[in-house]
């Protein structure tokens, strides 16, 4: 029993040291001419920290990502008219399903990109912490 406790204590020390030694790495991604899905997958990988050698699923990577020119990204196919973003208020008749065009008019390209990236993050307590490290400019 004591051996396993010592192992866990050592692992915790290593985690803390890794986090202290990591410098915040900043990425700037220009979205001009790139497709929505390609940008989203690249950013999701960076935000999770999967491209670093010290990747741990339970630790938020010390990274910041800035996406510029979001309004100049390419949206291929007929997604503008056919893609729908659903949200439900919880009340009868409270299901809203605006198309991509309607969301862009109301909230901008930032919302589209953020939703795509959010869908690629794990659905747990780390998701909001990871998404805080993302900045999108139109």
Task: Please give the residue ranges for each predicted region.
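Ribosome large-subunit tunnel/peptidyl-transferase-proximal elements
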Residues: 14-115, 121-125, 135-138
């Amino acid at each position: 029993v004591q051996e396993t406790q010592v192992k866990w204590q050592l692992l915790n020390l290593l985690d803390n040291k890794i986090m202290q030694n990591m410098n915040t790495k900043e990425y700037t991604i220009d979205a001009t001419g790139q497709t929505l899905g390609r940008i989203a997958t690249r950013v999701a990988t960076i935000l999770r920290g999967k491209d670093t050698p010290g990747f741990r699923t339970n630790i938020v990577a010390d990274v910041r990502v800035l996406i510029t020119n979001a309004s100049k990204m390419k949206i291929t196919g007929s997604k503008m008219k056919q893609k729908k973003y659903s949200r439900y208020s919880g009340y009868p008749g409270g299901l809203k399903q605006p198309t991509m065009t309607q969301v862009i008019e109301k909230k901008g390209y930032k919302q589209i990109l953020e939703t795509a990236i959010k869908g690629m993050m794990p659905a747990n307590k780390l998701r909001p912490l990871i998404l805080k490290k993302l900045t999108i400019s139109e």
